[in-house]
Amino acid sequence: MQTLTYAQARLAAFLFFSASGLAYGLFTARIPSLKEQTGAASDELGLVLFALGAASVVGLSGAAALVRRFGVKAVSLAGSLIFFFGLLVAGLAEQVAVLAVATALVGLGFGLLDVAVNVAGIEVERRWKKASMNVIHAGYNVGVVAGSISAAVFTGLAVAPLWNFVLPCAILLLVLLRAQHYLPVPEELQQSSAEKPKTKSRVTGFVVFCGVLSSATYVTEGAAAEWGSLFLHQVQGAPESMAALCYGVFGSCALACRLIADRLRAAYGDVNVFLTGAVIALCGMTIVLFAPHWTVSLAGYAVFGTGLAPVVPILFALAGRFGGMPLERATSVVALFAYGGLLFFPPFFGFLAEHWGLLRSLSVTLLLLTGLLAGGIVLKRGDKRRRGV
């Protein structure tokens, strides 16, 4: 049997993350076309998108048990197949109810894949003792960019969403069928079902702490994704075409940072990179909110994306390494907090904006980022205790 190498394992996890990003990028970019295709009203579309979040939580909640029962490789591939099938159904949908079912399938697949591939990513770091999670998570950013570009091209050519979904996903699926064989499996998950312990482990405080910090991180990212362009246009006076660059600038800088962050982790340590990222993110969002001109605010989003990028991958790595729980359960808990924050909390900024205005509403992110920085200080103290400093 061929020995699995570090490069093969890291690339396999990267590719599965890119599949998730590709599907999300394709789906979100073609929402206007799907809305027109199904005749969905705005409130109906809101319920459709809620189905995405709700189904994701279901997938995240059940993924740990499935990973333990069927393994990392099977659940990663199954999650990918489920959300690719969901995209196929969405492309065929002519009724809102069918689109809602399709969206739920996409969300369910996301949840299952996220936990499984994070388990694989943590195992890459654990087995080869090399910082890798940021590069692996960068696969998601690459997939989102590829999906968005693909959607722009297909939309410009007046190609229906169905074919826009089928062609890129079919190509990537062929790659994943090969890549699954190179996903590393933790030793404790290689036992037969009869050998695996039946006792249920309790969720530890440290894993919950990592989950809360990851949730705060993704709430602020969701605020940038869903409200950043509107803030630049309505509050800072940016032209609509320039305001639309907001999340692209944020995402591009996040991708660039993730590609180098593992080297920084290896050189300076997880907690130091975490703290530095939190400080940079807080400075970036402060620039965004209080800049005198929209161009400076847009630059602030670049700083914000750079600082926020390494935080969540580090939290997954720490939870897997020091959580005191089975790897798949620790990963599931952190993912549930993280994506719960990303999917459910950003819409509340709209409610706050109705009462306080958009500037004050988004100022809540400064409190969250301050809490993230405080959490980093707690992690730093814990790191010193572990090292006996």
Where do the PLM segments sit?
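Short amphipathic helix-loop junctions that connect adjacent transmembrane helices
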Residues: 29-43, 226-242
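Helix-breaking motifs and short loop linkers at transmembrane-helix boundaries and internal kinks
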Residues: 39, 71, 92-97, 237, ...
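Short hydrophobic/small-residue motifs within alpha-helical transmembrane segments
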Residues: 53-54, 141-146, 251-252, 256, ...
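Helix-to-loop junctions at the C-terminal end of transmembrane segments
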Residues: 59-71, 155, 257-269, 353-354
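Primarily marks hydrophobic transmembrane alpha-helices of the MFS/SLC 12-helix fold
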Residues: 73-76, 274
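Cytoplasmic helix-loop-helix junction between adjacent transmembrane helices
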Residues: 103-139
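Helix-loop-helix hairpin linking two adjacent transmembrane segments in secondary transporters
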Residues: 136-184
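C-terminal transmembrane helical hairpin of 12-TM major facilitator-type secondary transporters
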Residues: 268-315
